């Protein structure tokens, strides 16, 4: 299997889902970088741990205040910043084993039955593995983001949205020139937009008309010319959107096989 690091993050409202996802990854002995973006001390201490899992506490003082997850979910701006943090460490790694790792961002609501299929798809693709989400960019991107980036809504408005739930970056397995392009064309500008509130969350935007990190990722994927993947959960062995609303009322304590059956896709 191509070496892969799974990256994720959660605050208290996704603690239960994170425990389930980390449990699934521990059973696969996966390499994981897990970021605490707002867990209580008790929750952080209760997370599954194993040798391949590195736990980080997100360093909020280093970043603009709009990343605060307690205010409008931090505009989801912490996600591109975390992805860039991991990718930049891989790019500068002295250890060859670390430098060969690809990166898979996975929202805390994902659940893994396998790693090899998605690792193979990332390594064998064009450099960025990403699927589509519902609707078009015109429907789910506030015009202020296009204004900030100085690009035409007409040029991108009819294009499909990218799904930022599960995104793979072949930064370790790709040839150096392609890995550089992934960083230059996707990772770096995704982070730059996330750090600028007028870009990732322009005035007048909300979850009713904008998809923050996903909106700018969609633009960058289209601009760079990456193709969307069509892989299903059956092929990948990864389920997404397992953090369904009813778990808020009934809890996340179900056995893993039952929990995984309730994932959206």
Across the structure, where does each feature detected by a protein language model lie?
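Glycosyltransferase catalytic domains, chiefly GT-A lineage
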Residues: 1-265
